[in-house]
């Protein structure tokens, strides 16, 4: 980020390539709408570009990037006042980003992902968000706290409650 802030365009290309798939996957899972996820994805990167000159390395770039995404999601939900239903093919769209699966394996994985998705949809938004940031983005508790604006213990509590509810939902 420092190299790009200093004017190195190749550094931006490297940052974008390194973080685009994780960021888009996070947004798609939160929004459950491909077109809206793409729109907010572009908006997040536009905000990164706009803020490049004033960026301070207080945290890792990925933490800063996901904090921007978190704030942008909150703006969207505040404006929309609702969460749209998940499109039926959201998992397939995300799976299309990956290669190498047989049709049988994809069907089995799809069924398993669908069960997990249903259980995750039943989680409160705060618990679902911290669970996705921890499991999918592999962020630390401190990074999740910075992104969501809550303390480490609150993050731990939300993760624990989310896992308990997820287990109960999958075992039902």
Summary of predicted features, one role per range:
Residues 24-27, 78-81, 123, 128, ...:
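Short, Lys/Arg-enriched C-terminal cap helix and immediately downstream tail that follows
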Residues 5-6, 29-32, 43-60, 79-81:
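Sigma70-family region 2
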Residues 118-129, 133, 137-154:
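Helix-turn-helix DNA-binding module
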Residues 16-20, 24, 34-51, 139:
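Conserved RNAP core-binding helix
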Residues 50-57, 67-88, 109:
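Arg/Lys-rich amphipathic alpha helix in sigma70-family domain 2
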């Amino acid at each position: 980020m420092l190299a790009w802030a200093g004017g190195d365009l190749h550094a931006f290309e490297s940052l974008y390539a390194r973080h685009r798939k994780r960021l888009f996957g996070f947004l798609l899972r939160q929004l459950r709408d491909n077109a809206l996820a793409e729109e907010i994805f572009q908006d997040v990167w536009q905000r990164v570009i706009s803020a490049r000159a004033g960026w301070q390395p207080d945290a890792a770039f990925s933490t800063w990037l996901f904090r921007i995404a978190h704030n942008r999601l909150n703006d969207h939900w505040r404006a929309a006042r609702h969460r749209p239903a998940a499109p039926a093919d959201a998992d397939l769209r995300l799976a299309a980003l990956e290669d190498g699966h047989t049709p049988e394996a994809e069907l089995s994985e799809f069924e398993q992902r669908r069960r997990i998705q249903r259980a995750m949809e039943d989680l409160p938004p705060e618990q679902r968000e911290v669970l996705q940031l921890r499991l999918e983005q592999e962020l630390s508790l401190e990074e999740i706290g910075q992104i969501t604006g809550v303390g480490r213990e609150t993050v731990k509590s939300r993760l624990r409650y989310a896992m308990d509810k997820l287990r109960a939902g999958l075992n039902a």
